[in-house]
Amino acid sequence: MLPAYLPNPAAALFGGGTPIDGGRRWSDGRRLLGDGKTWRGLVLGILSGVLLGLIQVSVQDACVFVWLPRHTVLSVLLLAVGALAGDMVKSFVKRRIGKERGAAWPLADQYDLVAGSLLLLLIGDYGFAAVNLTIPVIFWILVLTPLLHRAVNLIGYAIGVKDVPW
């Protein structure tokens, strides 16, 4: 999951610039995604997740890491892209229900990256997903994700990358 965990904070850190939605609005008059989803953030977020995943692939044969899933370039790419795709889908829905950028949306804020990354992994590399997404692995993903999400958001808020601590 490391390639899925890094893209969101990296997108926040390195983002800015042109919004992905180009300022366009849905039929409800609200922005499609908002200013927080930018092309630079998307590209650099995905690249950061892929880079971390490639590092993981290069060291996965070390005896210390034999218990981790044996990632491939494809699984790493799908996890990184899926994490930000899940975040964008959540942002789209968030705008439709009237929540503004930065507004808290418990559970959706924590698990959007999990839903997006695992769904894309299931679609794009079912063999990898079928072997590696065991009940214990899914359990630990569900337990650790909100804890990591909270810690990263507090750090982002403390260093001024995020406007809100959630």
Curated annotation (Swiss-Prot):
Annotated EC: 2.7.7.67
Q: Where in the cell is it found?
A: Cell membrane
Pfam families in the record, alphabetically? CarS-like
| Metabolic or biological pathway, per its Swiss-Prot or TrEMBL entry | Membrane lipid metabolism; glycerophospholipid metabolism
Keyword terms, alphabetized? Cell membrane, Lipid biosynthesis, Lipid metabolism, Magnesium, Membrane, Phospholipid biosynthesis, Phospholipid metabolism, Transferase, Transmembrane, Transmembrane helix
Is Lipid metabolism included in the keywords of this UniProt record? yes
- Keyword Lipid metabolism listed: yes
* Protein's job: Catalyzes the formation of CDP-2,3-bis-(O-geranylgeranyl)-sn-glycerol (CDP-archaeol) from 2,3-bis-(O-geranylgeranyl)-sn-glycerol 1-phosphate (DGGGP) and CTP. This reaction is the third ether-bond-formation step in the biosynthesis of archaeal membrane lipids.
Name of the protein described by the UniProt record? CDP-archaeol synthase
The species is Methanosphaerula palustris (strain ATCC BAA-1556 / DSM 19958 / E1-9c)
Q: According to the entry, what is the taxonomic lineage of the organism? A: Archaea, Methanobacteriati, Methanobacteriota, Stenosarchaea group, Methanomicrobia
